[in-house]
Design a protein with these regions (language model features):
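Residue-level preference for the first positions of well-ordered beta-strands
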Residues: 2-4, 32, 89-91, 156-158
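Short, well-ordered coil/turn elements that cap or connect secondary structure elements
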Residues: 28-30, 57-59, 85, 152-154, ...
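Residue-level signal for inorganic ion chemistry
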Residues: 17, 53, 91, 162, ...
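Short, glycine/serine-rich, charged loops/turns that create anion-binding
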Residues: 10, 40, 96, 164-165, ...
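Conserved P-loop
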Residues: 2-80
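Portal/gating segments that form or line small-molecule/metal binding sites
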Residues: 55-106, 112-119, 123-126, 130, ...
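Short, conserved beta-strand edge motifs with alternating hydrophobic and charged residues
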Residues: 36, 64-66, 91-94, 159-160, ...
């Protein structure tokens, strides 16, 4: 079963997601409860966010898996490979970080991102537009497929995602491409999920 929890920044969605999965796991008697963390630390603000999330889940029995990209690889890190998926639940926190990591990979030995190196080889705006469209499609399909694989290996999967579509601001092209990809993925996840909840000012509102 998949539950998608969405909301704006600071809405309380993370706290609600942790409370929700702890309740469900206790109620259904899941023996293993995983926290799949996708955030990478690049600055002090990022470290503060990670520290806050660690404090939130301290003492709640989570087994933490650090998986900033290639989310299907988290499956091989589930501790009891021989146990049935019926004994496992997982919280994926969060989709917006995962998508950013997939779309903007780390720099290579030359100091250039892989995507930047590919763009350097293009010789015109039409080629660039085709490349960006293909990248949005490729990353979106990859993430949705890998989340589906993960969901097949746990009894309960809770996914936290961000609502990044309502500020009405035009950003640079790379950011707009990211927002488009997030829209595709969030719609795909909502279609896959049995439950969709939006958290508004700390209040969960059932959408599906």
């Amino acid at each position: 079963m998949i539950t998608l929890i969405t909301g704006g920044s600071g809405s309380g969605k993370s706290a609600y997601a942790e409370k929700y999965i702890c309740h469900v796991s206790n109620e259904k008697g899941y023996k293993e409860k995983y926290y799949i963390a996708t955030m990478q630390v690049f600055d002090c603000e990022g470290q503060r966010k990670i520290d806050r999330h660690r404090r939130l889940r301290a003492g709640k029995g989570f087994i933490t898996i650090e998986q900033p990209r290639d989310i299907q690889n988290a499956v091989s890190k589930l501790q009891s490979e021989s146990s049935l998926k019926t004994g496992r639940s997982a919280l994926l926190e969060c989709m917006s970080n995962l998508m950013a990591n997939e779309m903007f990979p780390p720099v290579d030995a030359s100091g250039m991102q892989t995507t930047e190196a590919e763009k350097e080889a293009l010789d015109g705006p039409e080629n660039m537009k085709d490349y960006e469209t293909a990248q949005i499609s490729r990353v979106s399909k990859k993430v949705l497929k890998e989340v589906s694989i993960l969901s097949e290996n746990v009894a309960e999967l809770v996914i936290v995602t961000n609502n990044v579509f309502e500020d009405g601001v035009c950003y640079d092209q790379s950011t707009m491409n990211y927002i488009k990809a997030m829209g595709i993925v969030n719609r795909g996840l909502a279609a896959m999920a049995e439950n969709v909840v939006e958290v508004v000012a700390g209040i969960p509102v059932a959408v599906k």
